[in-house]
């Protein structure tokens, strides 16, 4: 039995800080396994790794989890000092999404201490900030829980029932390679023209990566760029747009070397997980906000396998991926209480 508010706050601060101290940009999630295994043991939870490298912290009856609290172990690149200042935690992933992950682990512990009637787990997935291999593995193996709460920052009062889709286009341009005094245009010039035409054509397009050149006095023969676009329309419309954009690049001696698409997701507020989250927030005296988030998450993938899915978590999403990521310990605790209550509601509904 969990004994006091001070005890829970202490657990939240220590757990979250331990997670933040381990730098885990996409591809290095295994660094977090020893920390998660130690905390699982301390909190009386089971611990295992699946074939994709996803971490599973389990509670309740044996078997595949019926209810899953799904977070991710990776962060975007960019090391930040992990520290606790007063009651605020700072560090890479404080908001996206180790703060929510800590809240989910604590929430599972709280629910388990009261007794869970169904198999439940925190699933720490790999590669969410990349191509979501952890989520795709769950779906392809048929191991997706019946009810899923995705742990992403929603301000602690938001229930996200949708995410936009994402279209990523890799562009490669060629041009004259030689001395910069040569009048012939290099690949970088071609790339600038190509990107200008894309940005003029569609305001949703954003250039996220550029690579060209080796020296100030050499025009590069090859230049690369990545363009990302978020959208609400059906994925087939986005693919048609990508095809048109790529066709238009040939006049600039450029082409699309790859196109990747993540479809948008929009679930019903009446699904069991969303209803349980709303009920838990209201019980806690919080007025729920129903939101459709502007980015993407593993919810875009996992929604293929279940309709009972929604996202919720502590933290200001505006701080995600910034150098100012921070989260209050109290917000982690409040979210843990919401997760715990939601787990109980969903288990009791079976």
Swiss-Prot record:
It comes from the Archaea. CDD domains: M20_ArgE_LysK. Binds 2 Zn(2+) or Co(2+) ions per subunit. Its main location: cytoplasm. Its cofactor is Zn(2+); Co(2+). GO terms for cellular component: cytoplasm. Zn(2+) 2 binds at residues 96, 129, 321. It holds the Pfam family Peptidase_M20. PROSITE patterns: ARGE_DAPE_CPG2_1 (PS00758). Its EC number is 3.5.1.130, 3.5.1.132. It catalyses: [amino-group carrier protein]-C-terminal-gamma-(L-lysyl)-L-glutamate + H2O = [amino-group carrier protein]-C-terminal-L-glutamate + L-lysine; [amino-group carrier protein]-C-terminal-gamma-(L-ornithyl)-L-glutamate + H2O = [amino-group carrier protein]-C-terminal-L-glutamate + L-ornithine. The active site is at residues 74, 128. Catalyzes the release of L-lysine from [LysW]-gamma-L-lysine and the release of L-ornithine from [LysW]-L-ornithine. PANTHER family: [LYSW]-LYSINE_[LYSW]-ORNITHINE HYDROLASE, ACETYLORNITHINE DEACETYLASE. GO terms for biological process: arginine biosynthetic process via ornithine; L-arginine biosynthetic process; lysine biosynthetic process via aminoadipic acid. This is Putative [LysW]-lysine/[LysW]-ornithine hydrolase. Keywords: Amino-acid biosynthesis, Arginine biosynthesis, Cobalt, Cytoplasm, Hydrolase, Lysine biosynthesis, Metal-binding, Zinc. HAMAP family: LysK. GO terms for molecular function: cobalt ion binding; hydrolase activity, acting on carbon-nitrogen (but not peptide) bonds, in linear amides; zinc ion binding. It comes from Aeropyrum pernix (strain ATCC 700893 / DSM 11879 / JCM 9820 / NBRC 100138 / K1).
